[in-house]
Each structure stands twice: as structure tokens, then as C-alpha cells.
Regions:
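Extracytoplasmic gate region of multi-pass secondary transporters
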Residues: 5-63, 151, 155
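Hydrophobic core of transmembrane alpha-helices in multi-pass small-molecule transporters
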Residues: 18, 100-115
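Loop-to-transmembrane helix entry/capping segments in MFS-fold secondary transporters
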Residues: 42-43, 130-139
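Helix-to-loop junctions at the C-terminal end of transmembrane segments
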Residues: 60-71, 159
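Cytoplasmic membrane-interface "Motif A"-like loop-to-helix N-cap segments
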Residues: 69-80
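C-terminal ends and interior cores of transmembrane alpha-helices
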Residues: 82-95
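Intracellular juxtamembrane helix-capping segments at the cytosolic ends
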Residues: 115-128
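A membrane-interface helix-boundary motif in multi-pass transporters
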Residues: 157-174
Length: 193
């Protein structure tokens, strides 16, 4: 663990995972309240949250399979793109609250964004394989949880201060891009190759 923590790759993974989970939970925790605030019924908002999990299952399986063919970085980038699209759809829904945009948000978040989980362990294993993998991945998970906690908290604080979720969703979308770049910089493909 001590050797891993002294590498750039470890810290790029940490940045990628923290930023990715920030976006994930910023959206997941606030989307239902947000959808109700902008005019969707409580039933539709709850349906959207449940549907995200439903479409996540084939997305995770498909993206996990795809990662074995095209590489982990590509699949991580696809997952991050899912959260970018999700955040943009959420922002657009405030002005155009249509079922189509709701379906785009649900599909992008679930089928693409939730695919991040299909490669988290594999990315870390490709860079830090061996007997210390568990302690390295566990440490990264502790850092990741920080991003998962900060996302909902900061998004809620921004909403409370401004009365809008827009800035919070822009931040989440931006951090999704940061996450994708960080995983490319960690470069598991160079270890795998």
C-alpha cells in the first residue's frame, strides 16, 4: 500500500473515482426531489429513480463485457459520458419537462453511468495486481466514499443557497469529465499491454 500511494497512478485513480462518485450520488440523491420541483408527479419522479436501476443491470453487464474488448478507459469514459448526458438532460428538463428528456436522463444515467461499477475493480487490478490489491482497492474505496458523500451534500447546499439545482448539476457533469480524464491518465491500458 505504501508503495502504491507514492505513485501518480494511484492518485489519478483516486481523482477519477472521487469525481465519478461525486457525480453519481449528486444526481441519484437529488433527482427525485428535483423532478417533483420542476413539475413531474411524485409517481413519475419515483418511477425515474427505479427505472435507472432497472436499465443499469443490462448496462453494467454490457459495459463489463465491452471493457474486455475495447479497454477499461473507454468504458469508464462511456460511463462518465452517461452522467454528463444525464446532468444536461436534468438541466434541460427544467425548461422542457418532457417525457422524452426524462427517458434520456434515465437511460444515460442507468445504462451508461452506472456502468462505472463494472470496471472499478478491474481498473485497479490491472494497475495494482498482486497480493496487496485488497488493501489498495480498499483505500481507494475509502477515498471514493468521500466523493460519494460530498456530491449530495454540496449539491444540496447549492440548492439551498440558490433555490436551483442547475449549478450542482453543472458541477456534477464537469466532474464526470474530470473523472474520465483522470482514469485515462492513470493508464491501466499501459500496464495491461
Amino acid at each position: 500500500l505504501a508503495r502504491a500511494v507514492r505513485t501518480r497512478r494511484f492518485w489519478w485513480l483516486a481523482v477519477g473515482y472521487i469525481a465519478g462518485l461525486y457525480a453519481w450520488y449528486a444526481v441519484q440523491v437529488h433527482q427525485t426531489k428535483y423532478l417533483v420541483e420542476i413539475g413531474f408527479s411524485a409517481t413519475d419522479a419515483a418511477w425515474a429513480l427505479g427505472a435507472v436501476s432497472l436499465v443499469a443491470v443490462p448496462g453494467q453487464i454490457g459495459l463489463g463485457y465491452l471493457s474486455d474488448r475495447i479497454g477499461r478507459e473507454w468504458v469508464w469514459a462511456i460511463g462518465c459520458l452517461g452522467f454528463v448526458i444525464c446532468c444536461l438532460a436534468l438541466i434541460a428538463l427544467e425548461r422542457t419537462p418532457t417525457p422524452f428528456l426524462l427517458y434520456v436522463m434515465v437511460t444515460a444515467q442507468g445504462a451508461l453511468g452506472y456502468g462505472l461499477t463494472s470496471v472499478m475493480g478491474a481498473i485497479t487490478a490491472e494497475i495494482f495486481q498482486g497480493r496487496h490489491y485488497g488493501s489498495i482497492f480498499g483505500t481507494l474505496m475509502l477515498l471514493m466514499i468521500g466523493g460519494g458523500a460530498a456530491g449530495p451534500w454540496l449539491t444540496g447546499a447549492i440548492h439551498d443557497a440558490t433555490g436551483s439545482y442547475a449549478i450542482g448539476f453543472w458541477i456534477a457533469g464537469g466532474l464526470s469529465l474530470v473523472s474520465a480524464v483522470a482514469i485515462w491518465l492513470a493508464a491501466p491500458r499501459k500496464v495491461r499491454a
